[in-house]
């Protein structure tokens, strides 16, 4: 059964994107199918759909790097999530490149390694805004920057999502 999704049929401005009926993404044993409640739109989404990102999905594709929703199908190898869990997910651009599917759809298939339970106290709306900003900030500070607990950090340009996440 078809689902609604934003489609990028050719690289260009956001106005070129269209909502269409598409076949649902295929599941792997390490994946989670999510009934989307909210999906974030980030600067890389604009760059990817314009064809200016270092990974270029083959058109047509469904863009989108993050979402929140309810897990409706769990891959056989996934052990940390259950059907019905409230989840948030990050969709790596490499995953979109290999599958053609991102998070701007009614149903999203995400790698279980990038899918996390949402705390009961958090809304779907707030959860959808976390994966990219916080993931990017964490990667920059700890994986790339080697920040340690005893160090002091000055964050410049903290008005955006990644900068605010770094302060947090």
Name every feature range the model reports, one short phrase each.
Residues 1-3:
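Eukaryotic N-terminal low-complexity, Ser/Thr- and Lys/Arg-rich leader segments
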Residues 23-41, 52-93, 102, 114:
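Glycine-rich beta-strand-centered segment in the early N-terminal region that forms part
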Residues 44-50:
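Cytochrome P450 core scaffold surrounding the K-helix E-X-X-R motif
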Residues 96-112:
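A structural motif shared across PLP-dependent enzymes of the aminotransferase-like
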Residues 114-124, 150-152:
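Glycine/charged-rich beta-loop-alpha catalytic/anionic-binding loops adjacent to active sites
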Residues 128-168:
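Mid-domain Rossmann-like dinucleotide-binding core that forms the NAD(H)/NADP(H) cofactor-binding site
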């Amino acid at each position: 059964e078809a689902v609604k999704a934003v489609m990028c049929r050719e690289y260009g401005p956001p106005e070129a994107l269209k909502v269409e009926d598409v076949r649902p993404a295929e599941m792997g044993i390490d994946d989670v199918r999510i009934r989307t409640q909210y999906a974030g739109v980030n600067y890389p989404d604009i760059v990817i759909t314009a064809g200016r990102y270092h990974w270029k999905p083959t058109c047509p594709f469904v863009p989108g790097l993050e979402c929140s929703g309810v897990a409706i199908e769990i891959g056989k190898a996934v052990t940390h999530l259950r059907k019905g869990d409230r989840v948030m997910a990050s969709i790596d651009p490499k995953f979109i490149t290999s599958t053609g599917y991102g998070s701007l759809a009614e149903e999203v298939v995400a790698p279980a390694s990038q899918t996390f339970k949402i705390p009961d106290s958090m809304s779907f709306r707030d959860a959808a805004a976390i994966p990219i900003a916080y993931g990017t900030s964490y990667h920059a500070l700890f994986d790339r920057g080697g920040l340690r607990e005893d160090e002091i950090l000055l964050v410049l340009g903290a008005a955006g999502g990644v900068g605010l996440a770094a302060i947090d």
